[in-house]
Amino acid sequence: MPLYKVAGAAAAAGKSLEEVAAIAQKFADNMATIAVATKGATHPATGMEIAHIAEGTMEVGMGQHGEGGGGTQPMKSADETAAIMMDALLKDLNVKAGEKLMVVINGSGATTLMEQLIVFRACHKLLAEKGIEVVASAVGEILTVQETAGFQMFIARMDDELLGYWNAPCRTPYYRN
């Protein structure tokens, strides 16, 4: 979703198709995402469970619709889970102290806003301890998965150009800033 927001803002600013594609690629090259689930999704037509996650465990690295990913592990605290996920994202992007990031916490559908904010707080604290500045953020249910408990964590390295497009006004049925 953040990539579409940035590309859409570039298009709305009058950029050519080639320029929008280049801006979108720049954003894509500087972003990473990971998800965790504690309860799997159900099929909207049948109600059947798509993926089973055992009680007391969590699936880290699962796909948007509950596809298996990085593996199942015992349930951890919000702070521990946020650290596991953020460390993987920072390593993937090779983020260093002094850099500026966007952090998005997207609830999967059955995760409360309070829980999402607890995870965001943990991310913000962890990044501050590493000397990384959070310059943009979003927390909430932006893209959900039926009955899934968990969230997606998304980061993107930001510069003034990308930050300007992210902060540009936006009004859609599913996202507003």
Predicted segments, located by residue:
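Short, Lys/Arg-enriched charge-dense amphipathic segments
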Residues: 3-5, 40-48, 57-69, 118-131, ...
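Hydrophobic transmembrane alpha-helix bundles
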Residues: 12-22, 53-64, 71-82, 132-146, ...
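Generic preference for hydrophobic/aromatic residues in regular secondary structure cores
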Residues: 29-41, 70, 134, 166, ...
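C-terminal non-catalytic interaction/assembly regions of soluble proteins
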Residues: 88-177
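Internal, active-site/partner-interface "lid" segment
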Residues: 1-65
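Buried hydrophobic packing segments
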Residues: 3-6, 10, 85, 89, ...
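Conserved active-site and cofactor/substrate-binding residues in soluble primary-metabolism enzymes
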Residues: 1-2, 15-26, 55, 76-84, ...
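Glycine-rich phosphate/diphosphate-binding loops and the adjacent beta-loop-alpha structural elements
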Residues: 48-81, 85-118
